[in-house]
């Protein structure tokens, strides 16, 4: 219908949602809930390994009144781990230009490779932000790299709970306790780098590193 306002692209709506979700009082801060790498993989629509070829600042929409900007990264996709049913080959990824909206800064025109997780919007564009799991490929452990192919995907029925204080106990048989913050005061510590929360035939879940059971200090954390 002539004169009718055009609907906003899905990425513009997502930008507005990120702005609304910004915690009050944090100013320019970007705040994300903690998540284990396995949770990131399970909750992401797209998981790829890629290099960044170039970057460009682009408008968030075709509306001249819209002042929001996006960073568009042109990438060279090396391998896709998840998202085959949504997109075949990713050429561009988009992120908010504003860091307060969780925009991601990546190194372009370098040899650095990244593990990128993100969402595929209704218009087919791939959108990433700081609350996604985005890591230099060289920083991933061997267990993490191998788990991208199978173990993370096959165990999305397990629940991972972050432990902040003791005692910290499971509330369901399919739950694993993530204790990196308690033991190392950082999220992506030894447990995140070397263990997968795996489901057994009886429906229970527990941490495993390949065929090795969980280290004793991870088990002891559930005791008062």
Curated annotation (Swiss-Prot):
Subcellular localization(s) per the UniProt record: Secreted
Binding site for Zn(2+): 30
One GO BP: response to cytokine
Keyword Transferase: no
One term under GO cellular component: extracellular space
UniProt xrefs under InterPro entries: Netrin_domain, TIMP, TIMP-like_OB-fold, TIMP_C, TIMP_CS
Record site feature (Involved in metalloproteinase-binding), residues: 69
Residues in the signal sequence: 1-29
Paired cysteines (S-S): 30-102, 32-131, 42-156, 158-205, 163-168, 176-197
Region named Involved in metalloproteinase-binding: 30-33, 99-100
Alphabetical UniProt keywords: Disulfide bond, Metal-binding, Metalloenzyme inhibitor, Metalloprotease inhibitor, Protease inhibitor, Secreted, Signal, Zinc
SMART domains cross-referenced by the UniProt entry: NTR
Cell wall biogenesis/degradation listed as a keyword: no
GO terms, molecular function: metal ion binding; metalloendopeptidase inhibitor activity
Residue intervals of the NTR domain: 30-156
Tissue: Abundant in heart and present at low levels in many other tissues.
UniProt main location, coarse: secreted
Function: Complexes with metalloproteinases (such as collagenases) and irreversibly inactivates them by binding to their catalytic zinc cofactor. Known to act on MMP-1, MMP-2, MMP-3, MMP-7 and MMP-9.
Family: Belongs to the protease inhibitor I35 (TIMP) family.
Protein name stated in the entry: Metalloproteinase inhibitor 4
Organism: Homo sapiens (Human)
């Amino acid at each position: 219908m002539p004169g009718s306002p055009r609907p906003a692209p899905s990425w513009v709506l997502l930008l507005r949602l990120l702005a609304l979700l910004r915690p009050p009082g944090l100013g320019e801060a970007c705040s994300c809930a903690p998540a284990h790498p396995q949770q990131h993989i399970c909750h992401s629509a797209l998981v790829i390994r890629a290099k960044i070829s170039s970057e460009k600042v682009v408008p968030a929409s075709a509306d001249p009144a819209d002042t929001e900007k996006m960073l568009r990264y042109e990438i060279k996709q090396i391998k896709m781990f998840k998202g085959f049913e949504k997109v075949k080959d990713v050429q561009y990824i988009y992120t908010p230009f504003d860091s307060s909206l969780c925009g991601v800064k990546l190194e372009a025109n370098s040899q650095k490779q990244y593990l990128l997780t993100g969402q595929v919007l209704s218009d087919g564009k791939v959108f990433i932000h700081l609350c996604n799991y985005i890591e230099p490929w060289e920083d991933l452990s061997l267990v993490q790299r191998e788990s991208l192919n199978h173990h993370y995907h096959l165990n999305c029925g397990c629940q991972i709970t972050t432990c902040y204080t003791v005692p910290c106990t499971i509330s369901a048989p399919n739950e694993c306790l993530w204790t990196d913050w308690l033991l190392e005061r950082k999220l992506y510590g030894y447990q995140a780098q070397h263990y997968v929360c795996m489901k057994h035939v009886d429906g229970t879940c527990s941490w495993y590193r390949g065929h090795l059971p969980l280290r004793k200090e991870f088990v002891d954390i559930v005791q008062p």
